[in-house]
């Protein structure tokens, strides 16, 4: 049984960044993984600030395995690349006022997959990328293009060459299980029958209505349904019990559990407004387990490589979930 509830995180976790941490291997027993939903191998995002893409695709991968019987290892960098190309055009037309960054939130990963499709990890997995360096390079090219009024066609070609190389045949499509797919067709097939419901819980907006979540990385101003946190907790438990993974975004667990004594909604609101809870990281919740005291723990699949945590996984307590969750994505059963 699990001996320890928490991964002791380094002080840098106080900063809002989702890139890979220094190695912090936890030697806790891995027996809890027997309670996990089936997943693909843990990925390592390295210096790519796109945990939200990694977490979302991890959910799609597990959903496909558990409920459709097919194992697909998907390429987060495919969406990162398309996002930067998209932002280059937007930044150019806005004369440099639109941001160029790979930071975002879960609903935008869903949007990108629908818009640009997907390819397999084995066909597009460039190594040692630094998303901040790529964003700076794109911004530089946008700035030059604006200065010389080059137009979108020339800019798009220059940005395309600057980003990680895509084999020509991959652009045209690929074969999988004897069927030919373009990236767009493959993305559509992955999402067939899968729809996420995005949920958050804060008092400064009425429950039962959507609102544009005011976090720094919600560049697209996605509106999220607002519900009481206990209702969200129950939906997450139910989803996992029915073999559906859950997308999670929020503040990573700290050494000390947060208190849930008192009005939960007020505790959450205070943590948000004082920036104790930030939209720091995203993971896929892929199962439930219990400690020796019988407390429920969430099994979280991270994207910081297998050398981090417990073979790339960590455990989240009920208290951490109730206080530190910014938003979740639950598969819509309807």
PLM features: residue spans?
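Sec-dependent signal peptide recognition
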Residues: 2-8
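C-terminal motif of bacterial Sec signal peptides marking the signal peptidase cleavage site
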Residues: 15-17
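Active-site nucleophilic cysteine motif
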Residues: 46-60, 100-107, 281-282
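Structural recognition of the beta-strand scaffold that forms the well-ordered cores
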Residues: 50-53, 78-81, 109-112, 120-123, ...
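Sec-exported extracytoplasmic/periplasmic mature domains
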Residues: 56-65, 114-118, 241, 290
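Papain-like cysteine protease catalytic cores
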Residues: 73-177
